[in-house]
Protein backbone atom coordinates (compact mmCIF):
# COMPACT_ATOMS: atom_id res chain seq x y z
CA UNK A 1 0.00 0.00 0.00
CA UNK A 2 1.72 3.15 -1.23
CA UNK A 3 0.99 6.28 0.80
CA UNK A 4 1.87 9.92 0.15
CA UNK A 5 2.04 12.19 3.20
CA UNK A 6 1.99 15.94 2.57
CA UNK A 7 3.92 17.86 5.20
CA UNK A 8 2.43 21.31 4.64
CA UNK A 9 4.25 23.16 7.43
CA UNK A 10 4.63 26.24 5.20
CA UNK A 11 1.42 25.69 3.24
CA UNK A 12 0.54 24.24 -0.14
CA UNK A 13 0.11 25.52 -3.70
CA UNK A 14 -0.33 23.80 -7.03
CA UNK A 15 3.19 24.56 -8.25
CA UNK A 16 4.69 23.44 -4.91
CA UNK A 17 2.86 20.13 -5.20
CA UNK A 18 4.09 19.43 -8.73
CA UNK A 19 7.62 20.51 -7.76
CA UNK A 20 7.67 18.17 -4.75
CA UNK A 21 6.40 15.28 -6.88
CA UNK A 22 9.15 15.94 -9.42
CA UNK A 23 11.72 16.06 -6.61
CA UNK A 24 10.30 12.76 -5.39
CA UNK A 25 11.37 11.15 -8.66
CA UNK A 26 8.56 11.67 -11.16
CA UNK A 27 10.15 12.35 -14.59
CA UNK A 28 9.51 15.86 -15.89
CA UNK A 29 8.33 14.25 -19.14
CA UNK A 30 5.39 12.68 -17.28
CA UNK A 31 4.04 16.09 -16.28
CA UNK A 32 4.92 17.78 -19.57
CA UNK A 33 3.48 14.90 -21.60
CA UNK A 34 0.20 14.98 -19.68
CA UNK A 35 -0.26 18.71 -20.24
CA UNK A 36 0.52 18.30 -23.94
CA UNK A 37 -2.42 15.89 -24.25
CA UNK A 38 -4.77 18.79 -23.53
CA UNK A 39 -6.05 21.04 -26.35
CA UNK A 40 -3.93 23.99 -25.24
CA UNK A 41 -1.76 25.71 -27.88
CA UNK A 42 1.79 24.62 -27.05
CA UNK A 43 3.07 28.08 -27.94
CA UNK A 44 0.88 29.68 -25.26
CA UNK A 45 2.84 28.29 -22.32
CA UNK A 46 6.16 26.75 -21.34
CA UNK A 47 7.10 24.49 -18.42
CA UNK A 48 10.39 24.12 -16.58
CA UNK A 49 11.78 22.63 -13.40
CA UNK A 50 14.61 24.35 -11.55
CA UNK A 51 16.77 23.63 -8.50
CA UNK A 52 16.57 26.22 -5.73
CA UNK A 53 16.73 26.49 -1.95
CA UNK A 54 14.64 28.06 0.79
CA UNK A 55 16.39 28.83 4.09
CA UNK A 56 19.10 26.33 3.18
CA UNK A 57 16.71 23.52 2.18
CA UNK A 58 17.32 22.29 -1.38
CA UNK A 59 14.11 21.91 -3.35
CA UNK A 60 12.65 21.73 -6.83
CA UNK A 61 10.71 24.65 -8.27
CA UNK A 62 8.09 24.15 -10.98
CA UNK A 63 7.80 27.14 -13.30
CA UNK A 64 4.93 27.81 -15.70
CA UNK A 65 5.30 30.72 -18.15
CA UNK A 66 1.97 31.70 -19.73
CA UNK A 67 1.26 34.20 -22.51
CA UNK A 68 -0.78 37.12 -21.24
CA UNK A 69 -3.53 36.84 -23.85
CA UNK A 70 -5.56 33.70 -23.22
CA UNK A 71 -9.18 32.89 -24.14
CA UNK A 72 -11.85 33.08 -21.45
CA UNK A 73 -12.34 29.68 -19.84
CA UNK A 74 -15.25 28.54 -17.71
CA UNK A 75 -15.31 25.43 -15.55
CA UNK A 76 -17.50 23.62 -18.10
CA UNK A 77 -14.89 24.30 -20.82
CA UNK A 78 -12.04 22.96 -18.68
CA UNK A 79 -14.00 19.88 -17.60
CA UNK A 80 -14.77 19.09 -21.26
CA UNK A 81 -11.13 19.70 -22.19
CA UNK A 82 -9.96 17.09 -19.66
CA UNK A 83 -12.68 14.58 -20.48
CA UNK A 84 -12.09 14.74 -24.24
CA UNK A 85 -8.30 14.44 -23.91
CA UNK A 86 -6.26 11.25 -24.37
CA UNK A 87 -5.15 11.25 -20.73
CA UNK A 88 -5.32 7.94 -18.88
CA UNK A 89 -8.62 7.38 -17.08
CA UNK A 90 -6.98 7.57 -13.66
CA UNK A 91 -5.42 10.94 -14.48
CA UNK A 92 -8.73 12.27 -15.82
CA UNK A 93 -10.60 11.14 -12.73
CA UNK A 94 -8.20 12.81 -10.30
CA UNK A 95 -8.01 16.03 -12.33
CA UNK A 96 -11.79 16.23 -12.66
CA UNK A 97 -12.26 15.75 -8.91
CA UNK A 98 -9.80 18.53 -8.10
CA UNK A 99 -11.26 20.97 -10.62
CA UNK A 100 -14.80 20.22 -9.47
CA UNK A 101 -13.90 21.11 -5.87
CA UNK A 102 -12.17 24.29 -7.04
CA UNK A 103 -15.06 25.35 -9.27
CA UNK A 104 -17.63 24.47 -6.60
CA UNK A 105 -15.88 26.76 -4.11
CA UNK A 106 -15.61 29.58 -6.65
CA UNK A 107 -19.29 29.20 -7.52
CA UNK A 108 -20.35 29.50 -3.90
CA UNK A 109 -18.11 32.50 -3.26
CA UNK A 110 -19.30 34.42 -6.34
CA UNK A 111 -22.92 33.27 -6.25
CA UNK A 112 -23.04 31.73 -9.73
CA UNK A 113 -23.83 28.31 -11.16
CA UNK A 114 -20.83 26.00 -11.24
CA UNK A 115 -20.83 25.71 -15.05
CA UNK A 116 -20.48 29.48 -15.32
CA UNK A 117 -17.50 29.80 -13.00
CA UNK A 118 -14.91 31.88 -14.83
CA UNK A 119 -11.20 31.36 -14.22
CA UNK A 120 -8.91 34.33 -14.77
CA UNK A 121 -7.30 33.97 -18.20
CA UNK A 122 -3.67 33.42 -17.16
CA UNK A 123 -4.59 31.80 -13.84
CA UNK A 124 -6.72 29.24 -15.65
CA UNK A 125 -3.72 27.85 -17.54
CA UNK A 126 -1.66 27.82 -14.34
CA UNK A 127 -4.38 25.85 -12.56
CA UNK A 128 -4.87 23.45 -15.48
CA UNK A 129 -1.14 22.70 -15.63
CA UNK A 130 -0.76 22.28 -11.86
CA UNK A 131 -3.84 20.09 -11.47
CA UNK A 132 -3.27 17.86 -14.49
CA UNK A 133 0.44 17.66 -13.65
CA UNK A 134 -0.35 16.59 -10.08
CA UNK A 135 -2.86 13.98 -11.26
CA UNK A 136 -0.40 12.55 -13.80
CA UNK A 137 2.44 12.40 -11.25
CA UNK A 138 0.29 10.64 -8.64
CA UNK A 139 -0.85 8.14 -11.24
CA UNK A 140 2.75 7.49 -12.34
CA UNK A 141 3.83 6.89 -8.75
CA UNK A 142 0.90 4.54 -8.15
CA UNK A 143 -0.18 6.32 -4.96
CA UNK A 144 -2.99 4.49 -3.15
CA UNK A 145 -3.77 7.07 -0.48
CA UNK A 146 -2.93 10.71 0.25
CA UNK A 147 -2.67 12.02 3.81
CA UNK A 148 -1.77 15.53 4.93
CA UNK A 149 -0.75 17.57 7.94
CA UNK A 150 -3.05 20.33 9.25
CA UNK A 151 -2.82 23.45 7.10
CA UNK A 152 -1.48 26.88 8.15
CA UNK A 153 -4.14 29.56 7.84
CA UNK A 154 -1.90 32.52 7.04
CA UNK A 155 -2.99 36.14 7.45
CA UNK A 156 -3.01 39.52 5.75
CA UNK A 157 -4.15 40.25 2.21
CA UNK A 158 -3.41 38.92 -1.26
CA UNK A 159 -3.70 40.58 -4.68
CA UNK A 160 -6.04 38.70 -7.05
CA UNK A 161 -7.89 39.26 -10.32
CA UNK A 162 -10.83 40.42 -8.17
CA UNK A 163 -8.75 42.92 -6.21
CA UNK A 164 -7.17 42.84 -2.75
CA UNK A 165 -8.68 40.01 -0.72
CA UNK A 166 -8.15 38.72 2.82
CA UNK A 167 -6.02 35.63 3.48
CA UNK A 168 -7.07 32.93 3.08
CA UNK A 169 -8.75 33.98 -0.17
CA UNK A 170 -12.54 33.38 -0.14
CA UNK A 171 -12.33 30.32 -2.42
CA UNK A 172 -9.56 28.87 -0.26
CA UNK A 173 -11.61 29.48 2.88
CA UNK A 174 -14.52 27.62 1.31
CA UNK A 175 -12.26 24.68 0.38
CA UNK A 176 -10.93 24.54 3.95
CA UNK A 177 -14.37 23.61 5.31
CA UNK A 178 -13.93 20.48 7.38
CA UNK A 179 -10.14 20.44 7.06
CA UNK A 180 -7.86 20.92 10.10
CA UNK A 181 -5.98 24.22 10.21
CA UNK A 182 -3.66 26.06 12.59
CA UNK A 183 -2.43 29.62 12.99
CA UNK A 184 1.19 28.91 13.82
CA UNK A 185 2.67 29.98 10.47
CA UNK A 186 3.31 33.66 9.87
CA UNK A 187 1.62 36.22 7.66
CA UNK A 188 0.99 35.97 3.93
CA UNK A 189 -0.90 33.52 1.77
CA UNK A 190 0.16 30.03 2.83
CA UNK A 191 -2.55 27.96 1.13
CA UNK A 192 -3.72 28.77 -2.40
CA UNK A 193 -7.09 27.74 -3.87
CA UNK A 194 -5.43 25.14 -6.12
CA UNK A 195 -3.43 23.69 -3.23
CA UNK A 196 -6.52 23.50 -1.03
CA UNK A 197 -8.52 21.89 -3.85
CA UNK A 198 -5.89 19.17 -4.34
CA UNK A 199 -6.12 18.10 -0.71
CA UNK A 200 -9.89 18.59 -0.42
CA UNK A 201 -10.38 16.29 -3.41
CA UNK A 202 -7.70 13.65 -2.82
CA UNK A 203 -6.66 13.48 0.85
CA UNK A 204 -8.34 10.73 2.87
CA UNK A 205 -6.78 11.61 6.20
CA UNK A 206 -5.34 14.61 8.05
CA UNK A 207 -3.11 14.81 11.09
CA UNK A 208 -0.03 12.81 12.00
CA UNK A 209 1.72 10.77 9.34
CA UNK A 210 0.36 7.21 9.10
CA UNK A 211 2.59 4.28 10.03
CA UNK A 212 4.69 3.45 6.98
CA UNK A 213 8.22 2.74 5.81
CA UNK A 214 9.49 5.85 4.01
CA UNK A 215 10.76 5.12 0.50
CA UNK A 216 11.16 8.66 -0.81
CA UNK A 217 11.13 12.34 0.16
CA UNK A 218 10.48 15.27 -2.16
CA UNK A 219 10.68 19.02 -1.51
CA UNK A 220 8.81 21.59 -3.59
CA UNK A 221 9.54 25.30 -3.26
CA UNK A 222 6.94 28.04 -3.48
CA UNK A 223 7.44 31.26 -5.41
CA UNK A 224 7.78 33.50 -2.35
CA UNK A 225 10.63 33.44 0.16
CA UNK A 226 9.10 33.93 3.62
CA UNK A 227 11.03 35.61 6.44
CA UNK A 228 10.01 33.19 9.17
CA UNK A 229 10.17 29.67 7.73
CA UNK A 230 11.32 27.98 4.49
CA UNK A 231 8.54 28.15 1.89
CA UNK A 232 8.74 24.45 1.09
CA UNK A 233 6.28 21.57 1.04
CA UNK A 234 7.67 18.13 1.78
CA UNK A 235 6.22 14.88 0.50
CA UNK A 236 6.93 11.58 2.21
CA UNK A 237 6.19 8.48 0.15
CA UNK A 238 6.12 5.11 1.83
CA UNK A 239 4.73 1.62 2.09
CA UNK A 240 2.12 1.01 4.77
CA UNK A 241 2.96 -1.55 7.40
CA UNK A 242 1.05 -4.71 6.56
CA UNK A 243 -1.13 -5.27 3.54
CA UNK A 244 -4.13 -3.29 4.75
CA UNK A 245 -4.55 0.46 4.96
CA UNK A 246 -6.68 1.98 7.70
CA UNK A 247 -8.42 5.31 7.34
CA UNK A 248 -11.24 7.25 8.94
CA UNK A 249 -14.48 8.14 7.16
CA UNK A 250 -17.86 9.62 8.00
CA UNK A 251 -21.11 7.75 7.31
CA UNK A 252 -24.12 9.90 6.41
CA UNK A 253 -27.57 8.28 6.40
CA UNK A 254 -31.21 9.17 5.94
CA UNK A 255 -34.49 7.36 5.21
CA UNK A 256 -36.65 8.49 2.28
CA UNK A 257 -40.25 7.32 1.77
CA UNK A 258 -41.96 10.18 -0.07
CA UNK A 259 -39.84 10.97 -3.09
CA UNK A 260 -40.16 10.30 -6.81
CA UNK A 261 -37.78 7.35 -7.43
CA UNK A 262 -36.80 8.81 -10.81
CA UNK A 263 -34.86 11.48 -8.94
CA UNK A 264 -32.91 9.08 -6.73
CA UNK A 265 -30.41 8.19 -9.45
CA UNK A 266 -29.68 11.88 -9.95
CA UNK A 267 -28.99 12.23 -6.23
CA UNK A 268 -26.33 9.51 -6.36
CA UNK A 269 -24.69 11.18 -9.36
CA UNK A 270 -24.58 14.53 -7.55
CA UNK A 271 -23.06 12.95 -4.45
CA UNK A 272 -20.31 11.21 -6.42
CA UNK A 273 -19.59 14.38 -8.41
CA UNK A 274 -19.27 16.26 -5.11
CA UNK A 275 -16.55 13.88 -3.95
CA UNK A 276 -18.35 11.21 -1.92
CA UNK A 277 -16.26 8.06 -1.59
CA UNK A 278 -19.37 5.95 -2.18
CA UNK A 279 -23.15 6.22 -2.02
CA UNK A 280 -25.92 3.64 -2.17
CA UNK A 281 -29.63 3.05 -1.66
CA UNK A 282 -30.99 0.01 0.18
CA UNK A 283 -34.68 -0.93 0.48
CA UNK A 284 -36.47 -0.91 3.83
CA UNK A 285 -39.96 -0.87 5.32
CA UNK A 286 -40.85 2.19 7.40
CA UNK A 287 -43.67 3.20 9.69
CA UNK A 288 -47.21 2.75 8.39
CA UNK A 289 -45.78 -0.08 6.23
CA UNK A 290 -44.37 2.39 3.72
CA UNK A 291 -41.75 1.02 1.32
CA UNK A 292 -38.73 3.30 1.45
CA UNK A 293 -35.00 3.51 0.82
CA UNK A 294 -32.07 4.20 3.08
CA UNK A 295 -29.45 6.49 1.56
CA UNK A 296 -25.95 5.75 2.83
CA UNK A 297 -23.04 8.01 1.93
CA UNK A 298 -19.39 7.30 2.75
CA UNK A 299 -17.49 10.57 2.96
CA UNK A 300 -14.15 11.93 4.03
CA UNK A 301 -14.50 13.54 7.49
CA UNK A 302 -13.96 17.00 6.06
CA UNK A 303 -16.85 16.55 3.60
CA UNK A 304 -19.49 15.76 6.21
CA UNK A 305 -21.36 19.06 6.34
CA UNK A 306 -21.07 19.72 2.61
CA UNK A 307 -22.49 16.32 1.59
CA UNK A 308 -25.14 16.36 4.32
CA UNK A 309 -26.32 19.72 3.01
CA UNK A 310 -26.40 18.31 -0.52
CA UNK A 311 -28.61 15.41 0.65
CA UNK A 312 -31.04 17.82 2.31
CA UNK A 313 -31.06 20.03 -0.76
CA UNK A 314 -31.50 17.30 -3.38
CA UNK A 315 -33.93 14.96 -1.56
CA UNK A 316 -37.16 15.19 0.42
CA UNK A 317 -35.33 14.26 3.63
CA UNK A 318 -35.67 16.78 6.48
CA UNK A 319 -32.78 15.41 8.51
CA UNK A 320 -29.67 13.24 8.31
CA UNK A 321 -27.58 11.37 10.86
CA UNK A 322 -23.85 10.82 10.71
CA UNK A 323 -21.19 8.98 12.63
CA UNK A 324 -17.46 8.28 12.25
CA UNK A 325 -16.23 4.90 11.05
CA UNK A 326 -12.88 3.22 10.48
CA UNK A 327 -12.04 1.28 7.32
CA UNK A 328 -9.52 -1.38 6.40
CA UNK A 329 -8.75 -1.43 2.68
CA UNK A 330 -6.74 -3.42 0.21
CA UNK A 331 -4.41 -1.50 -2.07
CA UNK A 332 -5.78 -0.82 -5.54
CA UNK A 333 -4.45 1.01 -8.56
CA UNK A 334 -5.41 1.43 -12.18
CA UNK A 335 -3.25 0.11 -15.01
CA UNK A 336 -3.56 0.05 -18.78
CA UNK A 337 -3.12 -3.44 -20.20
CA UNK A 338 -3.02 -4.55 -23.85
CA UNK A 339 -5.92 -6.61 -25.23
CA UNK A 340 -7.27 -7.51 -28.66
CA UNK A 341 -9.68 -4.59 -28.17
CA UNK A 342 -6.79 -2.18 -27.60
CA UNK A 343 -5.37 -0.83 -24.33
CA UNK A 344 -7.90 -1.23 -21.51
CA UNK A 345 -7.82 0.20 -18.01
CA UNK A 346 -8.08 -2.42 -15.27
CA UNK A 347 -8.06 -2.23 -11.49
CA UNK A 348 -5.24 -4.17 -9.81
CA UNK A 349 -6.00 -5.11 -6.20
CA UNK A 350 -3.15 -6.05 -3.87
CA UNK A 351 -2.74 -7.42 -0.37
CA UNK A 352 0.69 -6.10 0.54
CA UNK A 353 2.87 -6.95 -2.46
CA UNK A 354 0.64 -9.82 -3.62
CA UNK A 355 -1.87 -9.24 -6.42
CA UNK A 356 -5.23 -10.58 -5.25
CA UNK A 357 -7.22 -9.96 -8.43
CA UNK A 358 -7.46 -7.84 -11.54
CA UNK A 359 -10.86 -6.47 -12.57
CA UNK A 360 -11.96 -4.56 -15.70
CA UNK A 361 -12.69 -0.87 -15.21
CA UNK A 362 -16.36 -0.22 -15.97
CA UNK A 363 -16.04 3.15 -17.75
CA UNK A 364 -13.26 1.91 -20.03
CA UNK A 365 -15.22 -1.22 -20.97
CA UNK A 366 -18.42 0.74 -21.54
CA UNK A 367 -16.59 3.08 -23.91
CA UNK A 368 -15.17 0.15 -25.90
CA UNK A 369 -18.58 -1.53 -26.03
CA UNK A 370 -20.13 1.64 -27.48
CA UNK A 371 -17.32 2.24 -29.97
CA UNK A 372 -17.31 -1.34 -31.26
CA UNK A 373 -21.07 -1.93 -30.94
CA UNK A 374 -20.46 -4.93 -28.68
CA UNK A 375 -22.30 -5.99 -25.57
CA UNK A 376 -20.70 -4.85 -22.34
CA UNK A 377 -20.77 -8.45 -21.12
CA UNK A 378 -18.71 -9.58 -24.11
CA UNK A 379 -16.15 -6.81 -23.55
CA UNK A 380 -15.85 -7.83 -19.89
CA UNK A 381 -15.25 -11.46 -20.84
CA UNK A 382 -12.49 -10.55 -23.31
CA UNK A 383 -10.77 -8.17 -20.90
CA UNK A 384 -10.97 -10.65 -18.01
CA UNK A 385 -9.49 -13.38 -20.21
CA UNK A 386 -6.71 -11.31 -21.78
CA UNK A 387 -5.83 -8.79 -19.06
CA UNK A 388 -7.17 -10.33 -15.91
CA UNK A 389 -4.15 -12.43 -14.95
CA UNK A 390 -2.36 -11.16 -11.82
UniProtKB/Swiss-Prot annotation:
<protein>
    <recommendedName>
        <fullName>Putative nickel insertion protein</fullName>
    </recommendedName>
</protein>
<comment type="similarity">
    <text>Belongs to the LarC family.</text>
</comment>
<dbReference type="GO" id="GO:0016829">
    <property type="term" value="F:lyase activity"/>
</dbReference>
<dbReference type="GO" id="GO:0016151">
    <property type="term" value="F:nickel cation binding"/>
</dbReference>
<dbReference type="Pfam" id="PF01969">
    <property type="entry name" value="Ni_insertion"/>
</dbReference>
<keyword id="KW-0533">Nickel</keyword>
<dbReference type="InterPro" id="IPR002822">
    <property type="entry name" value="Ni_insertion"/>
</dbReference>
Amino acid sequence: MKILYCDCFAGIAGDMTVAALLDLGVPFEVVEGAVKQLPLPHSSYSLAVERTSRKGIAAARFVVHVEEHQPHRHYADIAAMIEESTLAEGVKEKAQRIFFRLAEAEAKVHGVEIGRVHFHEVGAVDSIVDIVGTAAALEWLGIDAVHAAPLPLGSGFVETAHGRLPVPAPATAELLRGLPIHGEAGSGERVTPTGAAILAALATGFGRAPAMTVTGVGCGAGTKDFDDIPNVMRLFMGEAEGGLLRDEVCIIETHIDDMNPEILGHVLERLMEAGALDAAFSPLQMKKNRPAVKLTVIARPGQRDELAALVLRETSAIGVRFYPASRLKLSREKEERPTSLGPVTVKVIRDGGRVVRVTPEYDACRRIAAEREMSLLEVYRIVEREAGEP
